[in-house]
């Protein structure tokens, strides 16, 4: 009888252990596929709701050939525009003369007419800088000789009679300055040096903090942003000024920041990916994109708001062309940087990583497990030796749970020592502990 009771207790303990293992495996599998299950359950939710919660299951990495084609077409158009159309360089790069005087009630059309009658040619630009009593008229033209400058000043004084600081009409109120074309070249040279130093520091940091494949992807994405932004300027015909060059450098920081946000999530999702066969590396990277999608959009929107405010102040209130050029290149760069961090940098990272032996072997194992229909951990148990087996489905889990709920109490009744995994059994005595000190003493 004792041997039979012992055998019964062993059977009950074994079933309880199997229940615990199956339950943990089912929970692990449920957690591993939470994004897919959530996306299927939230199918009736709106697009914005799924986008905000990160459960949209938008396929980005799986369609990376499409995004590579779109990105390649954009770069091709940008390069073709740069080569065949070229840039519209401002006076700081081509050299020229700037003439300015207090506005008063002067209109731009009147200034252009006086300039044409005085010199027989059109000015490059006539803008009104500032507002109110401090507003000035700024004329930019090709390089003028001393005689041409004096003739233009006389014509402007006769036509508009600008007033000096004492409130009386004076020729001294009209100022002129010449800009050498070498100054813009010096600014560009220094900007290129700063760009190279920036790229080197970025490459070192990402390589040390993450990995070399992320470095290659991030640097390529930044070059993509620079090329497309420059192509937009060439295609639309925006004037290139030193402020434009400075703006190109500022958008690199935003582009890198947005890219690193996604890369950090990719690293978190793919940490130890080779020890599991639930998802491939590409699927984990796509999950990271979905989880950071809304964050990238919110970051871009917050970055665009001050840029738009700067453009409004520069164009409608102050009329400062330098601020307009700076804000314009930043606006274009932020939009392109957001696109590249989601649809270009991460798909490129996945493409580079899939060329490695580790990722290729892991992808084959995942696909083999899915095709065979075996549990997620059966193959890992023999190859990696550390992963728990997953339950086949929820119905089997429910059946095991019901069986255990009946067997666990019997095991507890047959022995004072509870079996592993069995439910706790309350004491049978009539008097329960009160929790008070010295309660049982008389």
Curated annotation (Swiss-Prot):
Entry's Gene Ontology BP terms: intracellular protein transmembrane transport; protein targeting; protein transport; protein transport by the Sec complex
Gene3D superfamilies: Multidrug efflux transporter AcrB transmembrane domain
Location within or outside the cell: Cell membrane
Basic residues bias: start-end ranges: 433-442
Alphabetical UniProt keywords: Cell membrane, Membrane, Protein transport, Translocation, Transmembrane, Transmembrane helix, Transport
Record's compositionally biased regions (Low complexity): 402-432
GO CC annotation, single: peptidoglycan-based cell wall
GO molecular function: protein-transporting ATPase activity
Region feature Disordered, mapped onto this chain: 1-39, 366-442
InterPro entries: SecD/SecF_arch_bac (IPR022813), SecD/SecF_bac (IPR022645), SecD/SecF_CS (IPR022646), SecD_SecF_C (IPR048634), SecD_SecF_C_bact (IPR055344), SecF_bac (IPR005665)
Major localisation: membrane
Described purpose of this protein according to its UniProt entry: Part of the Sec protein translocase complex. Interacts with the SecYEG preprotein conducting channel. SecDF uses the proton motive force (PMF) to complete protein translocation after the ATP-dependent function of SecA.
Family: Belongs to the SecD/SecF family. SecF subfamily.
The protein's name: Protein translocase subunit SecF
Gene for this chain: secF
